[in-house]
């Protein structure tokens, strides 16, 4: 009987121990489950961070042009035409400052067999490459250019006049590709086809695609866009200063308004244009300017610019406004806000597009750049 009691007691103790062990196991499981639940977001966050770092460190995929490549350009009748490139051009004739500088910036100096048409000095950052190309101080004849055996010509609308190189079909029939800068009047009147900064971006991107250097072209354009965005962000909650972009034509003033690149550059630089609204691309009188009374005036100049046989190139151009007694009442004159602006930054500007934009922005909003 005593033995039976001892067996029963041992059995009860064993059951109790097992029960306590089971409770302990459940308690332990519950305790460890909670940290696992709260730790999950931390693990996900760490994984996301690691993936982001890996993506940042991974080299970006380089775009490559797929040939044959068909682009749209224009003929001298201002009609759109297409040309197909079987491969990247190897022998290029580059006409005018914008095209020369774009090709140099894209690293294509070794592809240029001849160039002509600079309006001034080449950009400082491109001078070394410029020294390596075959540059003509005077425009060669059509026959001389044919002798260079080019496979691509990039220029302005005027490049393809009969007095110069002839219409594009002459070259296309000889397997020589062509490209006209979009803002060189190749598409017709500006009132119907406004000239924009975005067109300058497109010239760079198109040339980049033709030569299979899209990564370089996109880097250039993206840098310009980032600087423009900085201006936009700054002005998001501010009133824009009013401005006029003018060229003295000897008593009247040519307006660079909303429909032409000069006006669009000024708008991108933060200006509110008070003359040259859409469809009004003519000239204004002194009286019109006094009536408009802009906060700032930008006077256009270029190398060799003169009025009445007087040299007004560079900073001298502002004297056409500041030293004219008729304009003494203008706010821009009284406040010292008449500025020079170079034509190369506001007409078929290419790489200099950002120079024109910053000329406007830095003069209107100097505090943004301090």
Q: What name fits each language-model region?
A:
Residues 118-122, 130, 255-281:
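Alpha-helical, coiled-coil/dimerization segments enriched in small aliphatic residues
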Residues 12, 23-100, 209-245, 363-370:
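Bacterial Sec-exported substrate-binding components of ABC uptake systems
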Residues 194-204, 209, 218, 299-370:
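Structured C-terminal subdomain patch of bacterial secreted/periplasmic proteins
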Residues 1-11:
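Bacterial N-terminal signal peptides that target proteins for export
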């Amino acid at each position: 009987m005593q033995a039976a009691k001892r067996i029963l007691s041992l059995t009860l103790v064993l059951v109790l121990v097992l029960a306590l062990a089971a409770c302990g196991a459940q308690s332990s499981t519950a305790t460890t489950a909670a940290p696992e639940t709260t730790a999950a977001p931390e693990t996900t966050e760490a994984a996301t961070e690691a993936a982001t770092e890996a993506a940042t460190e991974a080299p970006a995929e380089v775009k490559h042009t797929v040939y044959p490549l068909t682009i749209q350009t224009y003929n001298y009748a201002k009609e759109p035409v297409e040309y197909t490139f079987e491969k990247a051009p190897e022998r290029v004739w580059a006409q005018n400052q914008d095209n020369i500088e774009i090709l140099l910036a894209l690293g294509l100096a070794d592809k240029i067999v001849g160039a002509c048409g600079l309006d001034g000095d080449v950009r400082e950052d491109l001078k070394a490459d410029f020294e390596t190309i075959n540059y003509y101080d005077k425009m060669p004849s059509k026959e001389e250019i044919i002798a260079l055996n080019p496979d691509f010509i990039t220029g302005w609308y005027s490049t393809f006049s009969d007095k110069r190189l002839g219409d594009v079909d002459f070259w296309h029939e000889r397997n020589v590709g062509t490209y006209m800068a979009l803002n060189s009047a190749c598409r017709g009147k500006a009132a119907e086809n406004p000239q924009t900064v975005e067109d300058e971006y497109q010239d760079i991107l198109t040339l980049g695609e033709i030569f299979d250097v899209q990564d370089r072209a996109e880097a250039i354009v993206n840098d310009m866009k980032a600087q423009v965005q900085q201006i936009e962000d700054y002005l998001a909650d501010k009133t824009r200063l009013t401005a006029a972009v003018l060229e003295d034509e000897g008593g009247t003033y040519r307006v660079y308004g909303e429909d032409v690149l000069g006006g669009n550059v000024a708008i991108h630089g933060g200006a509110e244009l008070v003359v040259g609204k859409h469809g009004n691309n003519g000239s204004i009188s002194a009286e019109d300017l006094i009536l408009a009374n802009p906060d700032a005036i930008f006077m256009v100049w270029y190398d060799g610019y003169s009025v009445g046989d007087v040299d007004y190139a560079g900073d001298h151009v502002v004297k056409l406004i500041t030293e004219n007694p008729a304009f003494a009442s203008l706010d821009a004159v009284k406040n010292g806000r008449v500025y020079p602006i170079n034509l190369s930054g506001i007409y078929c500007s290419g790489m200099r597009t950002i120079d024109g934009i910053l000329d406007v922005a830095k003069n209107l909003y100097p505090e943004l750049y301090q």
